[in-house]
């Protein structure tokens, strides 16, 4: 497994890339995740993911993790996992893969950065 700080960098990047993807390329995003009725909401969630990723990336770049950074990372992870589980029931099972990815990131915010 990656050292916690590097894993946190991957986590931040994951939010930026997947959030931007939802905003920039609707066709490929829906090809993977399934069609969406209210795409403005997808863009909003994408923008929030980019913002969270940028904030977490800032902590990684500074090499300093504050309690607020950990809270933001874990609360956002929990929110995405809850949404993914719900979406997997009614939409695409691909969302369960996202749950696994998020579980992989949790140790980055619970273990000390060295």
Language-model-derived ranges and their functions:
Residues 1-114:
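Short amphipathic, positively biased membrane-proximal segments
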